[in-house]
A protein has these predicted regions:
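N-terminal first-folded block
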Residues: 1-25
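Long, charge-rich, low-complexity alpha-helical segments
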Residues: 26-77
Length: 77
């Protein structure tokens, strides 16, 4: 079993989405920013209450979730 100590889920916070340490920063936001080309250092500058390990664990969590379920993708014709 995977342990993600920095990832929390609370139905009362951000609609129950996975967040970083109970804060209003979602895993999806972190992954989206990195995917858009932002560096970890830039994220940490914008969110000084986050630690590098928070960002890395968010990426590991997202990768784990992606491996846990298959989603059919439509192929471009």
């Amino acid at each position: 079993m995977n342990e993600f100590r920095r990832i929390t889920q609370d139905p009362a916070l951000m609609g129950g989405k996975p967040c970083i340490r109970g804060q209003r920063v979602t895993v999806g936001m972190i992954v989206g920013q990195i995917g858009a080309g932002r560096s970890i250092d830039a994220l940490l500058a914008d969110y000084p209450y986050l630690a590098r390990e928070d960002v890395l664990e968010a990426l590991r969590y997202a990768a784990w979730r992606a491996e846990e379920r298959e989603v059919d993708l439509q192929h471009a014709s």
